[in-house]
């Protein structure tokens, strides 16, 4: 992970992976360790014959969606990944990154909140590196504050809407601060979501 930290410290406007490049100069949240870990770690459900539907909530630069596209292609899985974000600049950034990737036909970005997003088919997998600060001092940059604070997407809303959007056998993969574990497990139970893997 030293390579990621050094690129961010130098203020690089992009991060280059093996098969794609992520530009992050227009969005509030830059490429970081959390997103890279979630993109590499989240378990891909086994979906036979049909096309796997994936939703990336709060996509930012589109990093996680791109990592999942690469993994799904390697698995020879048919897929469609939808990426949503409430910040128009992040959506524009992710669209650019998607269009320049080898999976442009499988990726789409939309300016939408999770609360307002609907899809008739439901999703096999929902991923998110959600806002994580609660009741703490906010960054003066409004876009960065939105990306980092739970005001626009609380954990309760995140899990309730994930339940609404998931297929009956779908999976939700999140990366969260350890302090949120008790609350998340409680909300998972309320929403009838069963934890299968917790990694520290």
Model regions: which residues?
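Accessory (non-catalytic) regions of SAM-dependent nucleic-acid methyltransferases
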Residues: 2-9, 195-200
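Class I SAM-dependent transferase core
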Residues: 4-46
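Conserved Class I SAM-dependent methyltransferase catalytic core
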Residues: 27, 31, 153-200
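Mobile active-site "lid"/loop adjacent to the S-adenosyl-L-methionine
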Residues: 130-157, 161
């Amino acid at each position: 992970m030293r390579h990621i930290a050094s690129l961010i410290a130098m203020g690089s406007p992009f991060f280059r992976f093996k098969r794609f490049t992520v530009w992050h100069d227009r969005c509030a949240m830059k490429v970081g360790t959390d997103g890279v870990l979630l993109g590499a770690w989240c378990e891909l459900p086994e979906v036979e014959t049909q096309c796997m539907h994936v939703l990336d909530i709060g996509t930012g630069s589109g990093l996680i969606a791109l990592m999942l596209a690469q993994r799904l292609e390697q698995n020879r899985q048919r897929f469609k990944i939808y990426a949503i974000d409430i910040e128009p600049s992040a959506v524009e950034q992710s669209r650019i990154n998607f269009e320049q990737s080898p999976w442009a036909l499988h990726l789409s970005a939309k300016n939408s909140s999770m609360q307002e997003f609907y899809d008739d088919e439901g999703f096999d997998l929902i991923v998110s590196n959600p806002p994580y600060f609660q009741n703490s001092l906010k960054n003066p940059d409004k876009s960065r504050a939105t990306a980092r604070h739970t005001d626009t997407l609380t954990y309760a809303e995140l899990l309730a809407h994930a339940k609404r959007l998931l297929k009956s056998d779908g999976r939700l993969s999140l990366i969260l601060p350890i302090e949120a574990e008790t609350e998340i497990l409680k909300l998972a139970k309320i929403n009838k979501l069963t934890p299968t893997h917790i990694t520290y």
